[in-house]
């Protein structure tokens, strides 16, 4: 539980048992992790091998990200002070988007989605999330600012021949055909806007 902020703050957000205790293995913590999931305190977002529907058919059993039930709780676990929050963009620099990803995960779950994520076997591309949507898959890239670059997302869309990909950021709504930008504040409407 206490390792969650550090796990999410890493560039590669895949959950690593070795970060809990040197040499730790999944079996050492699987009961504790299951307890946290059973009580709805954390949510497991599995890694998938392909962005194809249904996503559950492509889940890796060992690769996953772990998200807290609530952005505020993650902030408290992280020792996030009101001064940092009120300082604006500095909070996103400090956590490299982890709070933003937490927020998006929370919104996707609230809308009844079951998010997953994809990363290439070579490690050169990753989608922050992917959801089943109207018989296909919507990959999502989360940006904590107005950065509109989406290299990994474009790679994923081309590789899996997806008709629609979503980037969410502080920028306004923008439909560029295959790629649509949904403002972070509106990500709860992904089913209607994508």
Residue ranges with predicted function:
Residues 20, 142-144:
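Short, flexible loop segments at the rims of nucleotide/cofactor-binding pockets, characterized by
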Residues 1-132:
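Accessory nucleic acid-recognition modules appended to NTPase machines
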Residues 117, 139-142:
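Short catalytic-loop micro-motif centered on adjacent basic/acidic residues
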Residues 63, 134, 182-185:
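Short, hinge-like loop/turn segments at secondary-structure boundaries
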């Amino acid at each position: 539980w206490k390792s969650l902020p550090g796990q999410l703050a890493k560039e590669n957000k895949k959950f690593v048992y070795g970060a809990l205790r040197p040499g730790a293995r999944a079996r050492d913590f699987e009961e504790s992790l299951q307890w946290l999931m059973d009580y709805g305190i954390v949510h497991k977002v599995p890694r998938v091998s392909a962005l194809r529907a249904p996503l559950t058919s492509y889940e890796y059993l060992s690769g996953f990200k772990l998200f807290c039930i609530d952005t505020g709780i993650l902030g408290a676990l992280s020792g996030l002070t009101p001064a940092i929050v009120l300082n604006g963009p500095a909070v996103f620099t400090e956590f490299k988007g982890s709070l933003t990803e937490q927020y998006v995960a929370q919104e996707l779950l609230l809308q009844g989605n079951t998010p997953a994520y994809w990363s290439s076997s070579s490690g050169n591309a990753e989608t922050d999330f992917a959801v089943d949507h109207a018989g296909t898959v919507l990959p999502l890239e989360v940006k904590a600012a107005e950065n509109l670059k989406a290299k990994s997302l474009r790679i994923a869309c081309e590789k899996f021949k997806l008709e629609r990909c979503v980037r969410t950021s502080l920028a306004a709504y923008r439909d560029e055909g295959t790629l649509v930008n949904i403002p972070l504040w509106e990500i709860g409407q992904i089913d209607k806007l994508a």
